């Protein structure tokens, strides 16, 4: 019987560079209030969001990804031709096939890199990071580009008081490559499909295609609404506050890291109240820098963690070599948490 030759990858993997792209247009809460009965004070108190970025016609999922990836490659000092795989996490690329990752890989100038999309909602970056780590250690790619990108403004119902203010657009990317020491810890991830209805698309694409007005939601003028993201806010809040803090602690335990050892906490930027509650539950020391990028970026789903990471490093609130806990959670419901060394 023939034996398969063992793969030869790196001993460990690490994040080597990070980049972000935020669309030019900044949208304050006042714009959101044009179509919902609310107030700037209420939006800020409930979510922490003051502004968000919305993409223009030329700021496509691919275009934003290329911009963020170029910055990540420059930060890592790696030429695109050395990228062996491109992993894109998104829920807002509307073409079912081909994967947008293939276009991004080509536009960046990779040398026929493997390229594919994944859909894991707001946990997508963590899923992509886990896949990238596995590829580097297994040996199927020396360097992997992981991208979280969203145009959630395309999936926002501006007449839905519960969600109209939440979502923003943008792209974040990291380069994952070989390391001689552990720099991406074990991933604690999973799903709770029994809660799938708590965050979902209002109408499936097949129902929207049929166009039976009697079964489709209508706007205030009687027009059929484009499918949008909806959520049961209180149910999601309770799940995130009580269950995701447990997952975050499990990730710390798996990495052999205590809260006192942490330098930075980068949770998915879903809601500032969720973030603050997790900090309290985890009993994080005051010296731990906590990402609150949501204030000016909004909830960008799969892009939120790399965007927040990029901003912390750019502003000096976090430093290269810092130990950071990252956790994403969202539609599915799904989650992924790990401890990383910042690039």
From Swiss-Prot:
UniProt pathway: Lipid metabolism; fatty acid biosynthesis
Family annotation (InterPro entries): ACP_syn_III_C (IPR013747), ACP_syn_III_N (IPR013751), FabH (IPR004655), Thiolase-like (IPR016039)
Reaction catalysed by this enzyme: malonyl-[ACP] + acetyl-CoA + H(+) = 3-oxobutanoyl-[ACP] + CO2 + CoA
Quaternary data: Homodimer.
EC class name: transferase
Protein name in the entry: Beta-ketoacyl-[acyl-carrier-protein] synthase III 1
Gene that encodes it: fabH1
GO BP annotations listed: fatty acid biosynthetic process
Gene Ontology MF terms: 3-oxoacyl-[acyl-carrier-protein] synthase activity; beta-ketoacyl-acyl-carrier-protein synthase III activity
Entry GO CC: cytoplasm
Functional summary from the UniProt entry: Essential enzyme that catalyzes the condensation reaction of fatty acid synthesis by the addition to an acyl acceptor of two carbons from malonyl-ACP. Catalyzes the first condensation reaction which initiates fatty acid synthesis and may therefore play a role in governing the total rate of fatty acid production. Possesses both acetoacetyl-ACP synthase and acetyl transacylase activities. Its substrate specificity determines the biosynthesis of branched-chain of fatty acids.
Region (ACP-binding): 269-273
Gene3D superfamilies from the UniProt entry: 3.40.47.10
Keywords, ordered alphabetically: Acyltransferase, Cytoplasm, Fatty acid biosynthesis, Fatty acid metabolism, Lipid biosynthesis, Lipid metabolism, Multifunctional enzyme, Transferase
Record-linked PANTHER family: 3-OXOACYL-[ACYL-CARRIER-PROTEIN] SYNTHASE 3, BETA-KETOACYL-[ACYL-CARRIER-PROTEIN] SYNTHASE III
Organism: Streptomyces coelicolor (strain ATCC BAA-471 / A3(2) / M145)
Superkingdom of the organism of origin: Bacteria
Family named by the database record: Belongs to the thiolase-like superfamily. FabH family.
């Amino acid at each position: 019987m023939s034996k398969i030759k063992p793969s030869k990858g790196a001993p460990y993997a690490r994040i080597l560079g990070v980049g972000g792209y935020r669309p030019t247009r900044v949208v304050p809460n006042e714009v959101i209030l044009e179509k919902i009965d609310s107030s700037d004070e209420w939006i800020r108190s409930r979510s922490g969001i003051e502004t968000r970025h919305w993409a223009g016609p030329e700021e496509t999922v691919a275009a934003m990804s290329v911009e963020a990836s170029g910055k990540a490659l420059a930060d890592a000092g790696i030429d695109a031709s050395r990228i062996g795989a491109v992993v894109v996490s998104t829920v807002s690329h509307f073409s079912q096939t081909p994967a947008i990752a293939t276009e991004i890989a080509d536009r960046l100038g990779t040398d026929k890199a493997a390229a594919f999309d994944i859909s894991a909602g707001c946990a997508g970056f963590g899923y992509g990071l886990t896949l990238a780590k596995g590829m580097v250690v297994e040996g199927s790619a020396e360097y992997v580009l992981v991208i979280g990108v969203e145009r959630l403004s395309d999936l926002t119902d501006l007449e839905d008081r519960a969600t109209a203010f939440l979502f923003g657009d943008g792209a974040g990317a990291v380069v994952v490559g070989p390391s001689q020491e552990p720099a991406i810890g074990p991933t604690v991830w999973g799903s709770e499909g029994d809660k799938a209805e708590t965050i979902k698309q209002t109408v499936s694409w097949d129902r929207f295609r049929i166009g039976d007005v009697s079964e489709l939601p209508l706007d205030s003028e009687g027009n059929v609404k484009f499918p949008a993201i909806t959520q049961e806010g209180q149910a999601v809040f309770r799940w995130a506050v009580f269950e995701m803090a447990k997952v975050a602690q499990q990730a710390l335990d798996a990495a052999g890291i205590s809260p006192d050892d942490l330098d930075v906490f980068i949770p998915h930027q879903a809601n500032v109240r969720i973030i603050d509650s997790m900090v309290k539950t985890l009993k994080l020391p005051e010296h731990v820098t906590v990402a609150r990028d949501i204030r000016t970026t909004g909830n960008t789903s799969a892009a939120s963690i790399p965007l927040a990471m990029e901003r912390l490093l750019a502003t000096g609130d976090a430093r290269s070599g810092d130990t950071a806990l990252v956790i994403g959670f969202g539609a599915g419901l799904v989650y992924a948490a790990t401890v990383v060394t910042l690039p």
